[in-house]
């Protein structure tokens, strides 16, 4: 369900509504910031105020911030000639963040193990991938409604 009213508030990137989350007449609005992260308390209060002014009579609305799922990527790569370690690490991090931003708050869209591999392999400075994990596993990760993936760290090991 779309968080139409919440999206009208400054610094809101996306929002989801969960009807009847706590019984009849209740609605939970889950907010993602415009930077694809946890919104500030000021933003959440602005959403509450805006919805309170516009909501239907009788609806009890709860506004909360989205919940991050921390993501750590560890990868062993063969670096391309002419690239430094820090360049490769930065480009891999950027490519992964772009992917996570694209899937943030999309219903039924897991963090795909194979799409992370594509992003790593496509990053400037990477000639080949030896192995990689997401949070220590070689598996895709699912998110529940109101959750989003947040990159914590990219750990790179160079393979010769």
At which residue positions do the language-model features occur?
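Carbohydrate-recognition loop of C-type lectin domains
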Residues: 1-109, 160
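An aromatic-glycine-centered, glycine-rich loop/turn in mixed alpha/beta architecture
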Residues: 88-160
